[in-house]
Amino acid sequence: METVLSLLNEFGFERTVEPLSDPIVVHAVPGSGKTTLIKQALIRNNNIEAVTFGVPEKANIHGTYIKKARQGQRGRGNYSILDEYLSGEYSTGFNCLFSDPYQNHGDCLRAHFIGRCSHRFGRQTVQILRDLGYNIASSKEDIVEKKNIFQLIEPEGVIICLEKGVEDFLKWHSVEYKFPCQVRGATFDIVTFIHEKPLEELVGPDLFVALTRHRSKLVLVSN
């Protein structure tokens, strides 16, 4: 436990008023350093094991990588970490649970630590997210552009949509696109998000994923 608690402090995660208990619950926004923290825990303490319901790491020569979790998995070893605990069914034996409630449906546990500062996207995106009700911050700057669909001559970066009408429009124009479920866990330099309804009417895990995949620029396109 001491290794994880030390790293949570080093990475700037905020302690909540929830009394410490087993398992430790950590909620973190995209780009907060969650995955890097878990990898550091594996390197620093060989008694720690980590598995995830998200995207697992590729095996390395040392064996210190985040492995894929199985449905119904039980924690093993002296200290077990489960990443993305909200994305699957798990059993007992885990000592530390990580996830992001904003990207998941359903109820979450009370957090002992939160990481709400993203180092991926910047303050322009954060302002949009905060206006939508998300408790999030950023350590950097980025660019957010808003365009009308008829101004969209050459879409930039990876195009994401979640509405059927937008999907049909993009198919009609033979434009390649992705759904939020296809890019969860991914990061791109530039993302173009195309939507019909106002963002306020789309609030939910899919929208949050779509608006948090970029590093430098987010283009919001509507009609």
Curated annotation (Swiss-Prot):
Q: In what residue span(s) does the (+)RNA virus helicase ATP-binding domain sit?
A: 1-136
Question: What is the similarity comment for this entry?
Answer: Belongs to the Tymovirales TGBp1 protein family.
State any single GO MF term.
ATP binding
What is the role of this chain? Transports viral genome to neighboring plant cells directly through plasmosdesmata, without any budding. The movement protein allows efficient cell to cell propagation, by bypassing the host cell wall barrier. Increases plasmodesma size exclusion limit. Acts as a suppressor of RNA-mediated gene silencing, also known as post-transcriptional gene silencing (PTGS), a mechanism of plant viral defense that limits the accumulation of viral RNAs.
Q: Which organism is it from?
A: Apple stem pitting virus (isolate PA66) (ASPV)
How it assembles, according to the record, is:
Homodimer and homooligomer. Interacts with capsid protein. Interacts with host AGO1; this interaction targets the host protein for degradation, thereby suppressing the antiviral RNA silencing.
Tell me which SUPFAM superfamilies the record gives. P-loop containing nucleoside triphosphate hydrolases (SSF52540)
Q: Where is the (+)RNA virus helicase C-terminal domain?
A: 137-223
The main location is host cell
Q: What is this protein called?
A: Movement and silencing protein TGBp1
One Pfam family this sequence matches: Viral_helicase1
Source species, domain of life: Viruses
- Gene Ontology CC terms, in alphabetical order: host cell cytoplasm
Keyword flag Transport: yes
Output the GO biological process annotations, alphabetical, semicolon-separated.
symbiont-mediated suppression of host innate immune response; transport of virus in host, cell to cell
Q: Which UniProt keywords apply?
A: Host cytoplasm, Host-virus interaction, Inhibition of host innate immune response by virus, RNA-binding, Suppressor of RNA silencing, Transport, Viral immunoevasion, Viral movement protein
Q: Reproduce the miscellaneous comment text.
A: TGBp1, TGBp2 and TGBp3 seem to act together for cell-to-cell propagation. TGBp1 is the main movement protein that physically cross the plasmodesma with the viral genome. TGBp2 and TGBp3 would facilitate TGBp1 function.
| Compartment list | Host cytoplasm
